[in-house]
A protein has these predicted regions:
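C-terminal motif of bacterial Sec signal peptides marking the signal peptidase cleavage site
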Residues: 7-11
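N-terminal helix-rich structural modules
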Residues: 20-190
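Active-site recognition of the HExxH zinc-binding catalytic motif
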Residues: 48, 360-374, 399, 404
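Contiguous, non-catalytic segments that form substrate-binding/exosite surfaces or channel walls
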Residues: 160-350, 354
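An active-site-proximal "capping" alpha-helix that borders the catalytic cofactor pocket
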Residues: 184, 392-409
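Post-HEXXH active-site segment of zinc metalloproteases
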Residues: 373-397
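Long, well-structured alpha-helical subdomains associated
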Residues: 404-503
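Extended, compositionally biased alpha-helical segments that mediate assembly or anchoring
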Residues: 484, 488-541
């Protein structure tokens, strides 16, 4: 699916007639090459014949969902891409799912486009916040409705399954067909219920079935799931599709950690009133090869771990599933994090940067989404509703810092034996440099910047004269605990105004850091990865 444009551009010209790229083309080519190409494969020998037959059907569903995400974020994919005559710019637009550079503050790079609409394509372009808030409709804040203009120019809410009826019906049919190949009873039930959910926009039963599913090898994360794209209110969810194959050996290594979640919740570094909720005991941790990705999960920066479902009712009843995407994680570690450490981490601490520490930090980031608090202690409803469009940034900040906290705790408890606390902190610091390059446009980017700036202000690290950074082991633990408490309190109090004020002041990249991030660009270290994927790549012709 993805091509190496450096080879493409060079290969298209006769040797005697090679011409220099224009400055604009050179800029676009550099931006495309900021994404290292990673081929998505898995060991087909570990799959049954029926599982191999099922995967192309799941990929077909994921492709339908990909087109729906384009509609949600911008509009018709084909019409937009056809309007871009330059091949290199079109390739970059495909990576970004539109004309805005996701990892550079959503700056437009296609002529004719201005600032990215905060409400994406979920709301009318001319709708104001005030108009929406005054409008009385019980479905307006649903995760699964589009807000459109009626013939009389008033607002109306339209369910996703109605707005996208033809595509949704086709996707549901394919899910039922895929269920026919499922040998695992749990997977079969989940796929059938997910098909039904597509047609009703009621995902509760299928989320519960997904959590009950334990012995499957193939997994499929599919549907309107995350609300990152809606930066106007944070209500609307975007479609995505992720096809996965479980790594059974690594998953066995992780299974023991799920039983420790209640104990970890009790020991969070915050006042007891913010940790009274008990996480579900049915939570599980598994490692996977990601083998196909579309929609929201494929735009810009690629996810390396997943924590679902988001439904608080399901989480309290069943816990949540943390999916560690091991092949994607290893690719980012090798192609991005290690090269960054050679430029920015003190040479005396580079030996502490280890994949197992990176894996643990990321894994417990996902675990941390299920910890803390889901419902405010101030009577303001659940945290997601109370913090509105700031929720995603603070939820990611919570997961980041509690993930670090839990990894260090488990090392000290003797539950994690192959890495040290020093490995954990120093690898986390290197990981922060990797993450802040996402920019401050996304929820993850804002979360990373708040953490980085808090650590800097507390002296958790220092910048050495030669331009590298050294972690202060005495101060970073205190900074970690204090930042964790601050985030948990903002969430637990449902302190929307506090969230707005803090994020505005601390969610930006400071000049001193930007200068060092620019050095990574000079060193031509990739910003992220892009996938070469599909049935042929997998060997499923």
């Amino acid at each position: 699916m993805m091509i190496l444009l450096t080879l493409f551009v060079a290969g298209c010209q006769p040797k005697s007639e090679k011409t220099a790229l224009s400055p604009q083309d050179s800029l676009m080519l550099a931006k495309v090459n900021d994404f290292a190409v990673v081929t998505l494969t898995t060991d087909l020998g570990k799959l049954t014949e029926k599982e191999k037959q099922m995967i192309p059907l799941l990929i077909e569903v994921a492709d339908i969902i990909d087109n729906l995400y384009w509609l949600q974020t911008l509009g018709d994919k084909t019409a937009f891409l056809d309007s871009i005559k330059d091949t290199i710019t079109r390739q970059f637009a495909e990576i970004n799912y539109g004309p805005w550079e996701r990892l550079n503050g959503n700056k437009p790079f296609v002529e004719g486009y201005g600032e990215k609409p905060a409400g994406a394509n979920f709301y009318p372009a001319d709708m104001t916040k005030e108009e929406f808030e005054k409008w009385n409709d019980p479905n307006k804040t649903s995760q699964y409705t589009l807000i459109l203009r009626a013939d009389d120019r008033s607002l109306k809410a339209v369910w996703y399954h109605e707005a996208y009826k033809d595509q949704i019906t086709r996707a549901a049919d394919l899910l039922n067909k895929a269920a026919g190949f499922a040998e695992d009873a749990g997977l079969k039930k989940y796929l059938e219920l997910r098909a039904e959910a597509f047609l009703t926009d009621d995902y509760f039963a299928s989320d519960m079935a997904w959590m009950d599913m334990k012995t499957n090898t193939i997994d499929f994360v599919i549907g309107p799931i995350e609300n990152y794209e809606d930066e106007l209110f944070g209500y609307k969810t975007s479609y995505e599709g992720v096809v996965l194959a479980k790594d059974q050996e690594w998953s066995k290594r992780l299974a023991k950690f799920a039983s420790l979640l209640p104990e970890l919740q009790k020991n969070l570094p915050v006042d007891p009133k913010y940790k009274k909720e008990k996480p579900g005991t049915d939570s599980d941790l598994n490692a996977y090869d990601v083998i196909y990705v579309t929609g929201q999960a494929n735009k810009g920066s690629k996810t390396i771990a997943i924590n679902l479902p988001n439904d608080e009712k399901v989480q309290l009843a069943k816990g949540s599933r943390r999916l560690q995407l091991k092949n994607a994680m290893k690719a980012k570690f090798d192609k991005i994090l290690l090269p960054i450490s050679e430029v920015l981490i003190d040479s005396g601490q580079r030996a502490n940067i280890k994949f197992d520490a990176f894996f643990s930090n990321v894994m417990f980031h996902e675990v941390a989404h299920g910890l803390g608090i889901k419902n405010t202690i101030t009577g303001k409803g659940n945290v997601r509703e109370a913090l509105k469009e700031k929720y995603s940034s603070f939820e990611e900040a919570k997961a980041d810092i509690l993930g670090l906290y839990m990894t260090t705790r488990l090392i000290e408890m003797g539950e994690i034996k192959d890495i040290t606390v020093e490995d954990c902190f120093i690898t986390y610091m290197a990981g922060l440099f990797r993450s802040v390059r996402f920019g401050a446009a996304s929820a993850h980017g804002k979360a990373n910047m708040m953490c980085y700036n808090y650590f800097e202000d507390k002296g958790a690290f220092e910048r050495l004269p030669e331009g590298t950074y050294r972690v202060n082991m005495d101060k970073i633990r205190t900074a970690m605990n204090e930042w964790a408490a601050k985030v948990l309190m903002i969430e637990g109090d449902g302190d929307y105004q506090g969230a707005v004020t803090y994020l505005d002041a601390n969610g930006k990249i400071r000049e001193s850091l930007q200068a060092d991030l620019d050095r990574l660009k000079t060193a031509r270290i990739p910003v992220d990865i892009v996938y070469d994927q599909g049935p042929k790549v997998l060997g499923l012709n």
